[in-house]
Each structure stands twice: as C-alpha cells, then as structure tokens.
A protein has these predicted regions:
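Glycine-rich acetyl-CoA-binding "A-motif" of GNAT/NAT acetyltransferases
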Residues: 50-53, 120
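Conserved acetyl-CoA-binding loop-helix of GNAT-fold acetyltransferases
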Residues: 87-106, 123-127
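Conserved GNAT acetyl-CoA-binding A-motif
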Residues: 101, 106-118
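C-terminal "cap" of GNAT-fold acetyltransferases
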Residues: 135-151
Length: 151
C-alpha cells in the first residue's frame, strides 16, 4: 500500500536513512519532520505495517537550504526535487523502488543527485530516463546532477 508518511513512520524512516548514508545525507527526527512539512510528496510503501521504502520530493519554490537543491533552482524554471528515496534492504527486488518512482509527477521535470561512486543508482536512474546534466562537489563528494524531463 502506498500512503503518506505519518509520524509513526519516523523511527523506521530514520533507521532506513541512517543505514544508507553512503547514498543520502544524515537525518534526525527534527530534520525529517521539517522535510516532510516542506514536501509536496512524502510517501511510503507500507507492507503490513513495515516501511518497505519511502520517497520525499520538494517543489521548486521550497525554502530548502541545500546546495544541490539550489543548483537546480539556479538553472531550471520548473522542476520537482527528489530529495531522497530509499528502499529497505529487506524489500529490495520486490518492485518497491518502481512503485515509488511511479508516484513521481510525469508533467514536471524531476531533478535529483547521485553520488558519483554509486554506480548502481546511476544505472537505475538512467534506465528510468534520467540524464546527467552536471556535477556539483559538496563536502568533498562529487554529486552527479540528473534530470528526468517531463513526458
């Protein structure tokens, strides 16, 4: 079942996030609450009460202090920023990621960044129609900036 993130999901989401720091930035409960408040989309795939995965997107006019978000805002007039998407290791290869990406808008470009060393994610996003549109070095890590054009 796909549904909105609820307060009761926060512990599971934070656990998933903190166990994926090789691919996403760190979050604490306060950060997550603020992010969900600013989001235009904050959803989970719920499998019998277990958060199998989640996605959080932000509108282009969000008040969001992120160099990666600003990189897109400085270059594109219209986009949705995919801040993070994580699938639980217990639910990989079950179509959870595909379900989350199916929920992304198709009529607006979707922008995201992937760490340069994350070959699996880069390959996955290219297969979904995302293309490389630049790079940004942030805290010593090279972020590959990717965009999926509107359909």
């Amino acid at each position: 079942m796909i549904r909105s993130i609820e307060q009761s999901d926060h512990d599971q989401i934070l656990d998933l996030n903190q166990n994926a720091l090789d691919a996403v930035g760190s979050l604490d409960n306060e950060d997550l609450s603020l992010l969900v408040k600013k989001a235009d989309q904050a959803i989970v795939v719920d499998t019998d009460g277990d958060v199998a995965g989640f996605v959080i997107t932000l509108p282009q006019d969000a008040d969001y202090d992120s160099s990666r978000f600003r990189w897109f805002a400085d270059r594109y007039d219209e986009f949705v920023y995919l801040d993070r998407v994580i699938v639980s290791p217990d639910h990989r290869r079950e179509g959870v990621g595909s379900k989350l990406y199916d929920e992304l808008p198709e009529d607006v470009p979707v922008a995201l960044e992937v760490y340069e060393h994350n070959d699996t994610s880069l390959k996955f996003h290219r297969s979904l129609g995302f293309r490389r549109v630049g790079e940004l070095e942030h805290n010593g890590t090279v972020n590959v900036m990717m965009l999926r054009p509107a359909s």
